[in-house]
């Protein structure tokens, strides 16, 4: 039997495998709230423009609300034979209100309908991601404020480089998340145009009011070109791009948590709430939450790559290939949502181990740059000369197996006779971080001010 929504031209129904590959209801049913919102706005516009009689409009609106209630309660039965969410809703609407339901699709195609549904869903989800990223920022800033003066090693190449503070390290991720939130908002602003009324690809001959439906659905304006309206999914690509970048940031932080919680580092502890055990090794406490965030970033990045590949060879306007925009987009954005929530929980659960952090901060000659800076500042050496002197002193200390602060003044003066005992003031890790007072530097006073600024800003924004 042919599909009664479009089957007039067909003498028989599709093959079973055709029905299976063609159907999207298994995943696009999550668009039901957006689909019904779009239909309510569309039918209201059809009534206001006189295209439909008010009696039909009222019946359709009441029927759509009944369908919505059935879906929300779990009473609705989705049928694969009806392909997608649009036809499932319309079929049930016809059962409820009769032939008037067939008027709902006046001046509309599934092409502009699904483009509208997807924009609404992505817009809603970007708003949720923005709020979740803000919550993670808040958790990071709160922890940073508590540990503004907790010294830890800063790394390059995963080798000890210069001392920083734990709070300063966390605030780096607050800044990254701020840019992520900016990308979410930028993507939202660009997608906030309404395709409804573009119809299949060429517009419609009915005297519709696209500005009215756009306004009713919270869009800034209708899309300006009917072909573009139904032919592109760059709004989903942009959202996925923003999500992928955010996922990379979360993955990097998750990797650090995995490293920091290891026995070899011991920088931080996670409670039982965010760790798991081993089925064979009773001593294990595995940072599985962090590892899963790290892994799930790959799914988000993969969804972006997948949709780019789907779209790259499609001529205008709509092709069925574009049905493949949904699963990856749904999964990626909801995966990022899960990861943001998990990271916020872990940040609030993290317990730094100050003695381990401080001990590591002083290892690996991490104050060598402070020594070089002292030679420049106090003795007037060009920085390159100071760099060489410091390098030779590091070599002396390494040969003895001690830190720079353990070298005698005589040993230092053997490399640079003008060095005085005042040099020892810059070789402690606390003095090192306290001296980094440049804007954006790791000095505890800077970190406190930045954390407080962020907490104030986050309390004032949605």
From Swiss-Prot:
A single MF term (Gene Ontology): argininosuccinate lyase activity
Reactions catalysed, as given in the entry: 2-(N(omega)-L-arginino)succinate = fumarate + L-arginine
Entry-linked CDD domains: Argininosuccinate_lyase (cd01359)
One Pfam family linked to the record: ASL_C2
InterPro entries named among the record's database cross-references: Arg_succ_lyase_C, Argininosuccinate_lyase, Fumarase/histidase_N, Fumarate_lyase_CS, Fumarate_lyase_fam, Fumarate_lyase_N, L-Aspartase-like
Subcellular compartments: Cytoplasm
UniProt keywords, alphabetically: Amino-acid biosynthesis, Arginine biosynthesis, Cytoplasm, Lyase
Principal subcellular localization: cytoplasm
EC number: 4.3.2.1
UniProt pathway annotation: Amino-acid biosynthesis; L-arginine biosynthesis; L-arginine from L-ornithine and carbamoyl phosphate: step 3/3
Keyword Ribosomal protein among UniProt keywords: no
GO cellular component: cytosol
GO biological process: arginine biosynthetic process via ornithine; L-arginine biosynthetic process
Family, per entry: Belongs to the lyase 1 family. Argininosuccinate lyase subfamily.
HAMAP family for the chain: Arg_succ_lyase
Record-given protein name: Argininosuccinate lyase
UniProt lineage: Bacteria, Pseudomonadati, Pseudomonadota, Alphaproteobacteria, Hyphomicrobiales
């Amino acid at each position: 039997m042919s599909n009664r929504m479009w089957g007039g031209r067909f003498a028989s129904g599709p093959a079973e495998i055709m029905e299976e590959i063609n159907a999207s209801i298994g995943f696009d049913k999550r668009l039901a709230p957006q689909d019904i919102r779009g239909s309510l706005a569309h039918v209201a516009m059809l009534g206001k423009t006189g295209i439909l009689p008010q009696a039909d409009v009222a019946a359709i609106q009441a029927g759509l609300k009944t369908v919505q209630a059935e879906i929300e309660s779990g009473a609705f039965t989705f049928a694969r034979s009806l392909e997608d969410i649009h036809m499932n809703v319309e079929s049930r609407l016809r059962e409820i209100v009769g032939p008037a339901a067939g008027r709902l699709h006046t001046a509309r195609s599934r092409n502009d309908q699904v483009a509208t549904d997807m924009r609404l869903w992505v817009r809603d989800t970007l708003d949720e991601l923005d709020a979740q990223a803000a919550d993670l920022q808040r958790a990071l800033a709160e922890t940073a404020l508590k540990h503004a003066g907790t010294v830890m090693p800063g790394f390059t190449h995963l080798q000890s480089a210069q001392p920083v503070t734990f709070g300063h390290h966390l605030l780096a991720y607050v800044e990254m998340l701020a840019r992520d939130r900016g990308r979410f908002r930028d993507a939202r602003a660009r997608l906030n145009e309404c395709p409804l009324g573009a119809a299949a690809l060429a517009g419609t001959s009915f005297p519709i009011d696209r500005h009215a439906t756009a306004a009713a659905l919270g869009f800034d304006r209708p899309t300006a070109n009917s072909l573009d309206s139904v032919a592109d999914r760059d709004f989903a690509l942009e959202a996925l791009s923003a999500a992928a970048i955010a996922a990379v940031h979360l993955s990097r932080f998750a990797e650090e948590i995995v490293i920091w919680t290891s026995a070899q580092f011991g920088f931080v502890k996670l409670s039982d709430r965010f760790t798991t055990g081993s089925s064979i090794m009773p001593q294990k406490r595995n940072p599985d939450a962090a590892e899963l965030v790290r892994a799930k970033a790959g799914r988000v990045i993969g969804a972006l790559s997948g949709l780019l590949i789907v779209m790259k060879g499609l001529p205008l306007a709509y092709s069925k290939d574009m049905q493949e925009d949904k699963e990856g987009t749904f999964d990626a954005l909801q995966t990022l949502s899960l990861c943001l929530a998990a990271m916020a929980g872990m940040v609030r659960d993290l317990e730094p181990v100050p003695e381990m952090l401080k001990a590591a901060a002083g290892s690996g000659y991490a104050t060598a740059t402070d020594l070089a800076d002292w030679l420049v500042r106090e003795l007037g050496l060009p920085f390159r000369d100071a760099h060489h002197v410091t390098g030779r002193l590091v070599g002396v200390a390494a040969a003895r197996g001690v830190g720079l602060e353990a070298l005698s003044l005589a040993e230092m003066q053997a490399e640079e006779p003008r060095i005085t005992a005042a040099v020892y003031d810059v070789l402690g890790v606390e003095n090192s971080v306290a001296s980094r007072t440049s804007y954006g530097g790791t000095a505890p006073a800077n970190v406190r001010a930045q954390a407080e600024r962020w907490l104030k800003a986050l309390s004032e924004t949605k």
